[in-house]
Amino acid sequence: MSAWRIRVLATLCFLWQPRVHGQLPPPQNVTLLSKDFDMILTWTPGEGSPPDVLYTVRYESKTRMDKWIKVPHCRNIHSVSCNLTCVIPNFFIKFRAQVKATSGRFHSPWVKSQFKEYHLDVELAPPLLNVNVKENVIHVNATFPMAICVESLPWMYDFNLWEAGSEDKKQYKSIFRKKAVTIDTTALRGNYCFNARSSIQSIDFKHSKFSQPVCMQLNYEGEWKFPFSATIPVFVLLILLTSASIIWLLKQDAKHKKMPQTLDLSNCKIAGPTFCCELRENEFLTDCLICTDKPMSQGKKNKTLAQNNQMWMASFLPSSSSEEEEEEEEEDSSSFIPYTEMLQFPRKHFNFQTPRTADAETILDSTSGVLSVVGGSTLDLSALGFSFFPIRKNEMDTSGSQGNEKASHSHSSSLGRISLTDVRFPGPREHGQHGTDSNDCLEVSLLHTLMNSSCTRLPADEHCLYKKDHDFTICYQKPTLDQPVQVSENPLLNEDPSMEKFIYLQTLQVAEDEGFASDCDSGNFTEGTPPASTVLSDELRISDMEKRYDKKFKFKGYQHSHYMRRS
């Protein structure tokens, strides 16, 4: 090549070099930095740069030095920064970048940055807290403002919980990015605040700043709720008050109501003799006695018996005072079974009247009374409280004779129980033997004594049943034709065989520790020592009856016979 040609080329190069450098100055302050989980290259335009200047960026890693790789999204850009976060091939290797300015046909030289490692030099941003409030619990999780390419790194967050105005904060640390935290807020009342920060562990834990506090009311409505447990006693109290009010209103309404006239029995009086009875603690009435002057038919006797038992009943509770009485109770443990069959008796030749005698012991109101029978009417025993009549039927005695007639009956009355266990009516032969006797007696053996101060109050002209030594004596005078029969205690009984008679047999059972006064009006009551309480057994022995009781109603032709219980 000739010398002049070399000189021309050198001159042209000299002239061209100063002109280019004068048009595009290089970028200034080229820096590689990390901000909010990103790695960014930043710079500033050179002095005298035209407004339409463009910038191009490329990087190299320390493992492959002198091999610059262009960044696609940072080529001919107008901005003065380039995000290299997702361009970095490895987050654990250091790298650097360079940039130049271009304008038309002119460009500036490359300006390089320092080396940086993402995992060590990254700067973290505070996370965004998501608080989901539910009843008595809250759910807390965090959202990180980062690029998708770096989500695989082990990001964590911490958050604090505290009551507004208080410095006491409860910390929740090292919670992984996708994990939510559940907090029980049952005990929390009022305004509570939350804040959080992100963290990553490299050589040491690296933390971001705390986010701005997020405050909210926890259990705000619960402060004004009425506790459910308190409603139970209130409900019970309301029920009690309502019940008491209803009961009080019913009582007040009942006071203003009057008893119906049909149920008012205060003005009713029972016709017939008055019964006076002074009850003690061990006495109460359970039986009623009705006396009739007519024999009852066979079909009506059971009905009448039930009605009488329902109307007026007297029960006396016996008490044992000795071992002998207890043995008698066990021996006589069976109950009475009364005979209910009745004979039809004639209505003639019987009447009831009450002449007086001088026997003071058997007199009501210090006067005596007797039962007399007058022909032409039926004997009225209602004044003595008798209502049932015994059966009279022919029976064969032990010797085979049929001359004697036997009747036995027992029943409860208001004064107790009277029992005539053995009664024999004299036959025609016996009647002839004792025809001269004018007095007949009916023998009654009492199994129990009457109650003290219990008697039948009769009119002045009627006789009162009385007690002496625990036995009753009912005597009557029987006429031969039309003459009245005197009631007495004579042991003989004269009976007209042409007359059919009735004898009322009744059982009297009272408390064994009570006596009976013969005079209801005198107020003087005699206390007796009663025999032991006994009950009829299946068979009553005559010897036992004679040992226990002395006084008896006797009539002519009387004989003992065993009482057989009806099955």
From Swiss-Prot:
GO terms for cellular component: plasma membrane
Membrane-spanning residues: 230-250
Positions annotated with a glycan in the UniProt record: N29, N141
Compartment annotation: Membrane
Cysteine pairings via disulfide bonds: C74-C82, C86-C149, C193-C215
Cytoplasmic side: 251-567
GO molecular function: cytokine receptor activity
GO BP terms in the entry: cytokine-mediated signaling pathway; defense response to virus; response to type III interferon
Domain Fibronectin type-III: 26-121
Keywords assigned: Antiviral defense, Disulfide bond, Glycoprotein, Membrane, Receptor, Signal, Transmembrane, Transmembrane helix
Lineage, uppermost ranks: Eukaryota, Metazoa, Chordata, Craniata, Vertebrata
Range of residues in the leader sequence: 1-22
Matches recorded under PROSITE patterns: FN3
Function per UniProt: The IFNLR1/IL10RB dimer is a receptor for the cytokine ligands IFNL2 and IFNL3 and mediates their antiviral activity. The ligand/receptor complex stimulate the activation of the JAK/STAT signaling pathway leading to the expression of IFN-stimulated genes (ISG), which contribute to the antiviral state. Determines the cell type specificity of the lambda interferon action. Shows a more restricted pattern of expression in the epithelial tissues thereby limiting responses to lambda interferons primarily to epithelial cells of the respiratory, gastrointestinal, and reproductive tracts.
Protein name: Interferon lambda receptor 1
Subunit structure: Heterodimer with IL10RB.
